[in-house]
Swiss-Prot record:
Protein name: Protein MrkE
Modified residues (4-aspartylphosphate): D110
Keyword Transcription regulation: yes
Keywords (A to Z) from UniProt: DNA-binding, Fimbrium biogenesis, Phosphoprotein, Transcription, Transcription regulation, Two-component regulatory system
Source species: Klebsiella pneumoniae
Keyword Ubl conjugation: no
Function text: May be involved in the regulation of fimbrial expression.
Amino acid sequence: MPGNKIGLLNVHHRVKLLYGEGLHIRNLTPGTEIAFYVPNNSTPQGDGVAVVMSGEKMKVIIVEDEFLAQQELSWLINTHSQMEIVGSFDDGLDVLKFLQHNKVDAIFLDINIPSLDGVLLAQNISQFAHKPFIVFITAWKEHAVEAFELEAFDYILKPYQESRIINMLQKLTTAWEQQNNAASGLASAAPRENDTINLIKDERIIVTSIHDIYYAEAHEKMTFVYTRRESFVMPMNITEFVPDALNIAASGQSKFLLTVAQVSIANRF
């Protein structure tokens, strides 16, 4: 596979290390694709790292203004994962500019960086339609609560042990794979291009993902709508609001909202 830096012998030895079986590799030409079939009852041995031979890699960026720290993290990612580092930055605004035109799956983020600190940067990123995983790696422990509120994947304090990073990389890879599998399942149901609904607050129209709506409550000729972060008062009764939500839910991508609309809508008398 072009650009793949994993040598065939290295792959062979790592599989042998994991499963205790030798595999014969011979007469391979450049570009040959190989697949390893491991019996279902095989159990990996030791602490080896399984090699996943797939065409898609997890795309990540590093945001760190200390050069040596940036290089160390880059080495750990390249050594202990199959992730592809598509950019390294030392300035928060540069990251926002990059993300306007590029999609990434995860961001390794320091907090004390120029122009826009890591917490503010994460708050901006949390508003994106595509929300990458965010892993804070910082010397500032006092921002852990904010990181939790932003639903960060992890919060790692400097100085860290290599094992801490390796463990995080493995968990992050698993979470990304599960996310992709879930997305593939939803795609087969032919989802709508935009799963959003317009809500009103302070005379402004707020375009909101229906996945953020978890509760709607009827009150006379108004409907109170609650999302994960805030609440809205819609100038319509609930029988007008619910069909809009159900029409979107009918696409197949919004089973959660369909359940909410059918079961969790309260009428106040």
